[in-house]
Curated annotation (Swiss-Prot):
One of its GO terms (molecular function) is structural constituent of ribosome. The lineage of its organism: Bacteria, Bacillati, Mycoplasmatota, Mycoplasmoidales, Metamycoplasmataceae. It comes from the Bacteria. GO terms for cellular component: cytosolic large ribosomal subunit. The keyword Cell membrane does not apply. This is Large ribosomal subunit protein bL12. The gene is rplL. Belongs to the bacterial ribosomal protein bL12 family. Keywords: Ribonucleoprotein, Ribosomal protein. The keyword Ribonucleoprotein applies.
Length: 124
């Protein structure tokens, strides 16, 4: 088997959608026994005068809009661990937290996808 190069791996990642990348990350966590809560982020050596950019955000569904069915499907897509009934309850109980500890870039993509469905999302 040929060795996978860094460049070919990155190119493969670029061709994946968000769901596939999330599945890959979860598989890597399981394969290598990575516990995200055990990761320590190094702080700056200075006195902390600079404002740090958020590295993880929370996505909240504020309003599902007029057509809830596609919103429920999108909730299931980004949170495959939820059953159809749980996703429906989450959408019906808006405002409700959709996802925690999401990278800001991924959160913006998710927000855009929900906005296209007529739902209102906030990123905190």
């Amino acid at each position: 088997m040929a060795k996978l190069t860094k460049e070919s791996f990155i190119q493969s990642l670029k061709e994946m959608n968000i769901k596939e990348v999330m599945e890959l990350v979860n598989a890597m966590k399981e394969e290598f026994g990575i516990d995200p809560s055990a990761v320590v982020v190094a702080g700056g050596a200075a006195g902390g005068a600079e404002v740090a950019e958020k590295t993880e955000v929370t996505i909240t569904l504020k309003n599902a809009g007029g057509n809830k069915v596609p919103v429920i499907k999108k909730v299931r897509e980004i949170s495959p661990e939820l059953s159809l009934m749980d996703a429906k309850k989450l959408v019906d109980s808006a405002p409700a937290k959709l996802k925690d500890n999401v990278k800001p870039e991924e959160a913006e993509e998710i927000k855009a996808a929900f906005a296209a469905l007529g739902a209102e999302i906030s990123i905190d």
